[in-house]
Amino acid sequence: IEKSSGNRSGKLLDIGCGAGHFLQAMKKTGWIVQGVDVSEKARKLVSNTFNLDVKSPLDWLSSDEKYDVVTCWHSLEHIHEPWVYLDKIRTHLNPEGVLVVALPNYNSTDAKRYGSGWAAYDTPRHLYHFTTESMEKIASSCGFSIQSMHKMNFDSFYVSILSARHMGKSFISGVLNGFISWLSAMFNREKCSSLIYIMK
């Protein structure tokens, strides 16, 4: 986050913050943090556990607060109209603000290996699925430019192991396919199971 934003501290918003561990970690490094989550249970958990401010999507959409960094860690694919959120995020970013989006990549080696059994399809919870090309198009249509892309190397193993389990395959086969996916991503990052997009 610090490398991507060029800031050691600032104001950060995490959309789809879940249990709040990322927010708490960033708070400990000196960031002012806020979360958004659709789950009232999650909002209460984060508030009670970490004493952090977490808004509902409706409350956030109606606010006008500005942030130096907005993060979406595997949350954009759960949103019915992700372009609406991206448009709103753009209005919430400071002039030099950064958007960080992590998404499953269905062009990955493990996605091709497992086909419809690929765990990261996660239907019906995942409403949209992205490639680097489709992400570039939606980002551009919402006024963003992708500055860089980064691999989430562990996801090659994690998603492969989950996929193997869902398909009744062995744990070892999941690890092996995860290794193959990880190795292929070493030579071509667009083969990685999940990618992080840094946008401005």
Annotate each predicted stretch with a short phrase.
Residues I1-Y114, L127-F144, F154, S194-K200:
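Conserved SAM-binding loop
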Residues A25-K27, V100-V101, A119, M167-S173:
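N-terminal start-of-chain detector that recognizes signal peptides
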Residues V54, A120-Y121, M149:
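Short hydrophobic/aromatic-enriched beta-strand-loop microsegments
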Residues N7, D122, E190-C192:
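A generic fold-level signal
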Residues Y114-T123, L162-K169:
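Short glycine/proline- and charge-enriched loop/turn segments
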Residues Q147-K200:
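A C-terminal cap/extension of S-adenosyl-L-methionine-dependent methyltransferases
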